[in-house]
Amino acid sequence: MTQMNYTGKVKRVAIIANGKYQSKRVASKLFSVFKDDPDFYLSKKNPDIVISIGGDGMLLSAFHMYEKELDKVRFVGIHTGHLGFYTDYRDFEVDKLIDNLRKDKGEQISYPILKVAITLDDGRVVKARALNEATVKRIEKTMVADVIINHVKFESFRGDGISVSTPTGSTAYNKSLGGAVLHPTIEALQLTEISSLNNRVFRTLGSSIIIPKKDKIELVPKRLGIYTISIDNKTYQLKNVTKVEYFIDDEKIHFVSSPSHTSFWERVKDAFIGEIDS
């Protein structure tokens, strides 16, 4: 746990909610409280704290809204539906959140994020950040690409695509692909194959790979064409991708630390296992 510079100043708060009825109700309550509270100033511009209301999808959207301000912003999530990995409060705990924010001294919990650089055949480089994962797929035909780790060719991949996830993203699409669940205090990336072809002619490792922070992953497609690139909940169609590079970003996402913060393993248990009979 670390702490942002805290001077006791008025906290600038942005409230981001999805369109569901319960989310709108929670947002309305927060607006009504904060607008008359001298300790808070409601503003979506240059906020100190971003409150996301909905679920993990809404938190991902909030992250991308403020991804260029991560060194100044802390996030807090309220879930109004299913349990989320990035949300510490339920919709009936709004009063608890308000009380904790009034007592807040700038403490934060930080998680690593993914940096992606996509090079096109005309030399342009498209850069992006991901909180969960970035995937590359070729829908028309089998994707053929070299997987390079630290400038050394590791394997020639043939299949539907490749997913590279962060530790917190390891519980999302990566897990559905058979990847491992990685604790977010481990600064590493996870490369997981999507429906790889393995036979006498074509072979890949066939299992997820954990890549430490100091290492770099490169994916070099061997065929021109249209590739589907997904960055968290955003999807792009890019033509003639020549290289995709993956790194752990120097910046992290920061969450407001509070007594209500649920441990990572508790979140995993609640999401995938539930109550255990004694």
From Swiss-Prot:
Localization terms from the record: Cytoplasm
Gene3D superfamilies, per database record: Probable inorganic polyphosphate/atp-NAD kinase, domain 1, Probable inorganic polyphosphate/atp-NAD kinase, domain 2
Organism lineage: Bacteria, Bacillati, Bacillota, Bacilli, Lactobacillales
Record-given protein name: NAD kinase
One cellular component term from this protein's GO annotations in UniProt: cytoplasm
GO biological process per UniProt: NAD metabolic process; NADP biosynthetic process
Family under the similarity heading: Belongs to the NAD kinase family.
Disulfide bond annotation, renumbered to this chain: none
Substrates-to-products reaction catalysed: NAD(+) + ATP = ADP + NADP(+) + H(+)
Cofactor dependency: a divalent metal cation
